[in-house]
């Protein structure tokens, strides 16, 4: 069972994301003084008075025909449906607007606890203005200045008072994974296809998913996953909007939070130079990796198409030789059912521990096949090896002189270890260290 859920809703530019970030304690939602900059539901976990809960930020709702508005309304309705408590944010500076009344009518139908937060009450003189908001018929208004942190404690007190009694601890066996890739490779459509729900705004306009969005789901075997959809990354020279700049930073954070990363390629466009750069971020972070070629249904194929693609990927992503490749279609759901098992297998590989005795047998067998190198008449001696970490599996090899361990021989030892043990989808690190 998930944690209790709080949805933050309201019209555009009333400070929902600022309040969300104040409660979450970090800058998760993109906040700018531009209407409509938060378009999707954004999730975070918060706690207050020893109660832990999830909070959802939503795009601004308005009764107008603005771009994306129907999708934003639909997303907000899903968020309200998921929520145990709803925080309705209005602006004390502007008073009640037609859009506020439109949102209030939506909230009447939910029959859920509503906390009315009157934001932008930045000084004591403005407190008298909040009484007008009783006219919305949603109970006592709470004066708040989310920018300055004034009144947020009262809102949190009210949230906790209305939470359901059950509180469930997080699952320590949860596997976290993210989808990374350039804009418009189909990451959001993949999420929607996997979940069977319009979880994020999926649009053919590149870059329509701006934030990293967490979604929890369980497979048929009871394994829980947290899926993080990241904003598409773009070359620095092509990032013009501040929001895009924030999104690249957030994508890096999403990779950092992940156990496994799905590197999504677009079959229609082929492999781009920047795809390799993006994948390099995950590789350097030591994450498990699956290379996902999306939009496979759009290609005209023959008996060699898949093999040709695999060969090209192996050539272009030489540093990802350990990463499995899967060809999928978010539209037709082709092969998507295989992804959870692949992610689980990679997670197991990341957490594999090899007993030192078994590891050293493999190392000695490797030396018998290919003796250690020499340099200026001095031979590399390997005394023993031991595993020192997981996620990724990391091994220290104790030697007589670190300088004698050539990169090529270290790669040879890595290949022998991979042959002996299952490390599919995860990098492994080998470190040569002089024995003292």
Swiss-Prot record:
Where is each EngA-type G domain found? 4-167, 175-351
- Family the UniProt entry places it in: Belongs to the TRAFAC class TrmE-Era-EngA-EngB-Septin-like GTPase superfamily. EngA (Der) GTPase family.
Q: Which gene encodes it?
A: der
A GO BP entry is: ribosome biogenesis
Gene3D superfamilies (alphabetical): 3.30.300.20, P-loop containing nucleotide triphosphate hydrolases (3.40.50.300)
MF term (GO), any: GTP binding
By its UniProt entry, which PROSITE patterns does this protein fall under? G_ENGA (PS51712)
Q: Quaternary arrangement and interactors, per the entry?
A: Associates with the 50S ribosomal subunit.
Domain KH-like, by residue range, is 352-436
Q: Which InterPro entries match?
A: G_ENGA (IPR031166), GTP-bd (IPR006073), GTPase_Der (IPR016484), KH_dom-like (IPR032859), KH_dom-like_a/b (IPR015946), P-loop_NTPase (IPR027417), Small_GTP-bd (IPR005225)
By its UniProt entry, which Pfam families does this protein fall under? KH_dom-like, MMR_HSR1
Question: Where on this chain does GTP 1 bind?
Answer: 10-17, 57-61, 119-122
Protein role: GTPase that plays an essential role in the late steps of ribosome biogenesis.
What's this protein's name? Answer: GTPase Der
* Domain of life where this protein originates: Bacteria
Keywords from UniProt, A to Z, are: GTP-binding, Nucleotide-binding, Repeat, Ribosome biogenesis
**Amino-acid positions noted as binding GTP 2 in the UniProt annotation, renumbered to this chain:** 181-188, 229-233, 294-297
């Amino acid at each position: 069972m998930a944690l209790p859920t709080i949805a933050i809703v309201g019209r555009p530019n009333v400070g929902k994301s600022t309040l969300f970030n104040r409660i979450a304690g970090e800058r998760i939602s993109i906040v700018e003084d531009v209407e409509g900059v938060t378009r999707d539901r954004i999730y975070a976990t918060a706690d207050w008075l020893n109660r832990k809960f999830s909070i959802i930020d939503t795009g601004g709702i308005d009764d107008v025909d603005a771009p994306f508005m129907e999708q934003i309304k639909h997303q907000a309705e899903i968020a309200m449906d998921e929520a145990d408590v709803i925080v309705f944010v209005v602006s004390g500076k502007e008073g009640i607007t037609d859009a506020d009344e439109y949102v209030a009518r939506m909230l009447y139908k939910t029959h859920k606890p509503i906390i009315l937060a009157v934001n932008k009450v930045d000084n004591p003189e403005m407190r008298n203005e909040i009484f007008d908001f009783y006219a919305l018929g949603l109970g006592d208004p709470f004066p708040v200045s989310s920018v300055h942190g004034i009144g947020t404690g009262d809102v949190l007190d009210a949230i906790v008072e209305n939470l359901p009694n059950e509180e469930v601890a997080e699952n320590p066996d949860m596997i976290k994974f993210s989808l990374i890739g350039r804009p418009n490779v189909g990451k959001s459509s993949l999420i929607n296809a996997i979940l069977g729900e319009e979880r994020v705004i999926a649009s053919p306009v590149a870059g329509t998913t701006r934030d990293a969005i967490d979604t929890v789901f369980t497979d048929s075997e009871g394994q829980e996953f947290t899926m993080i959809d990241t904003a598409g990354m773009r070359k620095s020279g092509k990032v013009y909007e501040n929001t895009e700049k924030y999104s690249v930073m957030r994508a890096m954070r999403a990779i950092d939070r992940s156990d496994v990363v799905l590197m999504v390629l677009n079959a229609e466009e082929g492999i781009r130079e920047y795809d390799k750069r993006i994948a390099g971020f995950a590789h350097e972070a030591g994450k498990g990796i699956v290379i996902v070629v999306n939009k496979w249904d759009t290609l005209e194929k023959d008996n060699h198409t898949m093999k040709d693609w695999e060969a090209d990927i192996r050539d272009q992503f030489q540093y990802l030789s350990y990463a499995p490749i899967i060809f999928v279609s978010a539209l037709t759901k082709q092969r998507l059912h295989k992804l959870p098992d692949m992610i689980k297998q990679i997670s197991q590989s990341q957490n594999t521990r090899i007993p030192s005795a078994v590891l050293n047998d493999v190392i000695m067998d490797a030396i018998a096949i290919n003796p250690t190198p020499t340099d200026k008449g001095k031979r590399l001696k390997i005394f023993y090896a031991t595993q020192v970490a997981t996620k990724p599996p990391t091994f220290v090899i104790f030697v007589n002189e670190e300088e004698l361990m050539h990169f090529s021989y270290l790669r040879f030892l890595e290949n022998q270890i991979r042959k002996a043990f299952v490390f599919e989808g995860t990098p492994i690190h080998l470190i040569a260290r002089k024995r003292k």
